[in-house]
A protein has these predicted regions:
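Short, low-complexity N-terminal intrinsically disordered segments enriched in polar/charged residues
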Residues: 11-48, 53, 57, 143-148
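A short gly/proline-enriched turn/hairpin at secondary-structure junctions
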Residues: 54, 59-69
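Residues that flank catalytic or metal-binding motifs in active/ligand-binding sites
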Residues: 55-57, 85-88, 120, 127-130
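Surface-exposed, charged secondary-structure patches
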Residues: 73-116, 123
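Bacterial N-terminal signal peptides that target proteins for export
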Residues: 1-8
Length: 149
């Protein structure tokens, strides 16, 4: 399911009750990337409570066509504990308050990955240094380096 369809699903069921911010209300791309890197670092360290602290309450999680609205840090930490893979960030692109991160999946401390070596992607909606939503999306195609003959 593409990100736009997934986001539309989340909006249609009222999961993203907070309206999208205007460009003036966004964190800087550098600050947004810092939040995504902190999330990845905490996930890889199996610091599920620490990862949960990066999220606003409530927070929305969309994965595999299912959407969850989690209300507490304990719920968010449990969700992280159930993730099967750790991963290394390959790239992060930011547009407004949306950051798309591509990861190379791996086993980790207390994690037995079902697809080590494969790439996965997620879109993070970040505002004021907190993650409001995490949406698994298809890995975007590599950026082209220009026209080819």
């Amino acid at each position: 399911m593409g990100f736009v369809r997934t986001l539309a699903l989340a909006l249609s069921v009222g999961l993203l009750a907070v309206p999208l911010a205007t460009a003036a209300g966004n964190d800087s791309p550098t600050a947004t990337k810092r939040v995504v890197r902190a999330w990845s670092s905490r996930l890889n360290a199996y610091d599920n409570a620490g990862a949960a602290q990066l999220f606003a309450h409530p927070a929305v999680f969309v994965q595999g066509g299912s959407a969850l609205r989690l209300e507490t840090s304990a719920q968010i930490a449990l969700w992280h504990r159930l993730l099967p893979c750790a991963g290394r960030i390959v790239s992060i692109t930011v547009e407004g308050e949306l950051a798309t991160a591509v990861f190379r999946l791996a086993n980790g401390r207390h994690r037995r990955c079902d697809a080590p070596g494969q790439k996965a992607a997620a879109v993070f909606r970040v505002r004021h240094g907190k993650i409001l939503a995490w949406v698994q999306v298809p890995v975007p195609p590599p950026a082209s380096s220009g026209p080819t003959a």
